[in-house]
Amino acid sequence: MRNVPILALVAILFALPASAEKPTVRPYAAGSLSGGIPLWNPGEKFVAIAGGSCAGTCPVYELYAFEDGRIIFVGKKYTGKTGVWKKQLTPEVYAELLTAVVHSRALDPDAKIKRGTCLKDRSVLTVMRNAPDGQSMLMALLNSGCDGYADMTRELEKTFIDWTEITPWLAPTK
């Protein structure tokens, strides 16, 4: 009987890592991952991903797709191009990427995505989109080394890269 509180505490501690991190809301002033002025303006509709660093040479970048078809790529480290690069594609690109993000449920606060064990030093994919109020953004972190996130992370990143046609900008030159 005396062990019941201890067992309950242990069960809670093991359950915490298994639950997914909930999406956060960031106001416009905090809407840039790199600091400074965000690449989006209040009222704009966008979806975006950002690849984070890892123990190796994972590309570090941000990739935004806007409702009007604008694409903005920011290469930071281990990318084919560094700095800010822009291109214009059709609005269909935004629609397809928005659909992919919504279907992944990465930004759904009610989603029950189970996160299993995680490998060390794997990159984190940040998934973002404008919030309904138009003045802030929704953001979620997906660790590519965690069970439950690995496939979703890989699929979302591939979808963004394929639809925005930025492979040459992303792949480092040899």
Residue ranges and their predicted role:
Residues A55-T57, K81:
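Short, cysteine-centered beta-strand-loop-beta hairpins and adjacent loop/turn segments enriched
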Residues P59, L63-K76, D121-S123:
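A short, structured beta-strand/loop element
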Residues Y61, G83-K87, G134-M139:
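Short beta-strand segments
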Residues M1-L7:
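Bacterial N-terminal signal peptides that target proteins for export
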Residues L7-A15:
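Bacterial N-terminal signal peptides
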Residues F73-P109:
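A short-motif feature that recognizes glycine-rich, charge-decorated loops
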